[in-house]
């Protein structure tokens, strides 16, 4: 377990009439739906749909005081007339790579803006309920049900069933955790989905058997030096230094830091226990989903708004089908060709950018935007932007911000509702209801477990088991698709070409040229321009790893522990925030006299104590390393300058050339994309965040997309700093008031 540690539609052809097909309900997503252009048939049961626009409309960009909107692609809307040839997959280049066995990088993945832990969601839910009660607004209250007393035999059967599913869950979790741990120890990289599954499984194991904290965690800490010796691939080779003592200390620091972060994430994943909870939230969610899926009965608006919050972006995107992913990419004008992981990565980054922009727009005010800015904002969110009045643009943007920021409806659900092209006359609640009907069954299972955790109710072992098995099946399916892509890539190599390249084997004898007789009337000339895409600017997985190694070497040369210190400070902030959230939850429950019923689990308390001990050990290791470096090569006159995390483009290019040869033009293109202010310098810590974000996904991106990722991360950091400053000011004001 200690090893998880290292956390680790371009151009389009003309519209053609489709053959007669069965009628489908309005708002349904067809596999052949092209949602970037309403001229394409198959969206609804209609046989002819007018184009949204007949002239090219180049995208405009929304800017707030020098903070531009990032955009993945820049292309005009399709035209209603000019099209000489039909688009074919051959016009786009799809790069497929096989499985790569790479060392797990010691970098923490960038967390999306606003991603909350279970305890933070519980706190938000309590605050929302109390606020509505104080304001006298509508609060969801389930219908009163007559409590039926169970017989003794029924109670015994329920308990036996509960423990049966609990032991099954424990056995399956243990098998999955052991398999993932073995993959990590052998140098394999866990995907984002696998890491999330591993984190949840560890939280389940500690929840089911709290005594494991006393056995597993100290045992892991004791065996860390042995594991590092037996499994050298667990750490990147760039940890090798001239000083054996310094190398040992750095490895120990890296592993302890990542282990402490992982344990803190596990603590935050474990829900609180509410002794007064009667399981109503789980039953209410089951009844709600049964209404919209089976009976056809319309739930109340309060139910729809309440349960829609559970379908978070990550949960929704990870379980959408490929036709739905393609439809969303086309709606948001993203590349719709590639693997499912690539499409999800594109959508995730776009949704993160939209979420950051929503907060900026809300801060500046919708009324302060110009018409072009309103059109750009609406178009980026999949809403109609052309041929409507300014008041209409402001109205639909204000409605979006109200649903997203005030009602906390996930961005993925809002985008998916736009992709279905539902009538504008439908209310937001009805649009969300229609959207929830299209989600796969696995999403409902995950949301059912989540609602129990947020409300502090007893988690149903059967529901948890079903969700775990479904997620494991999805992970295995991804592995099969990866192997299939690798085998197809091997088949593309012609056997004759492979044999001709063998040493000592003569090549094929040249055949005499044969002139073909071509009749003039049979010659077909294609006058359409060739779509080149991003050829020459793609960044492969191997090049990402080379860039990662170069950053590690540069950090080693600078003898910098800035990254470790920053991660330790973030870990301390997480621990403090967790403690403050616990106190706030008890404070909110004290308003209704229920604070005595809420308690932290025994495993969570034990893990918290262990994390506090590890933080003290990490502080000691950092102090020891700094002392070693000062006693070694770094003297008083050779101290590291103030801007130690800033490197020049020339340094980065030289470091990458030392590892492996990369074409000069690609190096220049990549470094230019990373240098957003064009001053010739790059912050190596920011570069590490981008590498870590891309390295966790098995995708290949372009240098343009790298620049957009940098812009998105910068926006998120600015917003996070503003929110922290605002929270600090509110706390100080509350302390002064008290």
UniProtKB/Swiss-Prot annotation:
InterPro entries: EF-hand-dom_pair, EF_Hand_1_Ca_BS, LETM1-like_RBD, LETM1/MDM38-like
Modified residues (N6-acetyllysine): 596
Annotated Ca(2+) binding sites: 675, 677, 679, 681, 686
GO cellular component: mitochondrial inner membrane; mitochondrion
SUPFAM superfamilies according to UniProt: EF-hand
Record localization: Mitochondrion inner membrane
Ranges facing Mitochondrial matrix side: 229-738
Keywords, sorted A to Z: Acetylation, Antiport, Calcium, Calcium transport, Coiled coil, Ion transport, Membrane, Metal-binding, Mitochondrion, Mitochondrion inner membrane, Phosphoprotein, Potassium, Potassium transport, Transit peptide, Transmembrane, Transmembrane helix, Transport
Transmembrane segments: 208-228
Positions of region (Disordered): 719-738
Family listed: Belongs to the LETM1 family.
Name of this protein: Mitochondrial proton/calcium exchanger protein
Organism from which the protein derives: Mus musculus (Mouse)
Gene transcribed to yield this protein: Letm1
